[in-house]
Amino acid sequence: MTLMILSIGIYRKEIRHMAVGFKVAFFYYQIGHGDFLHSVFSTVSYNLENGKWGSRFPTIMNELYQGTLDKDNVETAIEELKKIQLELQAFSPDKVVWDIDDLSNQPPWGKNISNDITNLSNYFVTSDGEDFITIFFNALEKAK
């Protein structure tokens, strides 16, 4: 099965405010607004790839970010996500990047975050209140 970022096709700046999610066959995993998803990718690129988008995690950052992930690349994406999750644990929540294209942009909630958020690996929570990385893993597992 193919994993898709639903509702955006090819991800563009002008549609970041649309609701998005991961779609695998008939399964839909709600994420939230496109600008939230862009923040996840921006945070990874800025903190883990020295701002060089896709240089360390090309399957997730390039292929999936463009809208689809081929079934043949799901295992690679899972391995990349494991590394991302592990490495984000070393960064405090204040290292979040809302928009790598404009580093002055801040999350709508500012610094007002839950005490449960201890690092960037558990910073991102979907619009359904679920841990983003857990939902991402679930979608990738379903896509196998």
Give, region by region, the residue ranges found by the protein language model.
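Acidic (Asp/Glu-rich) sequence patches and key acidic residues
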Residues: 2-138, 142
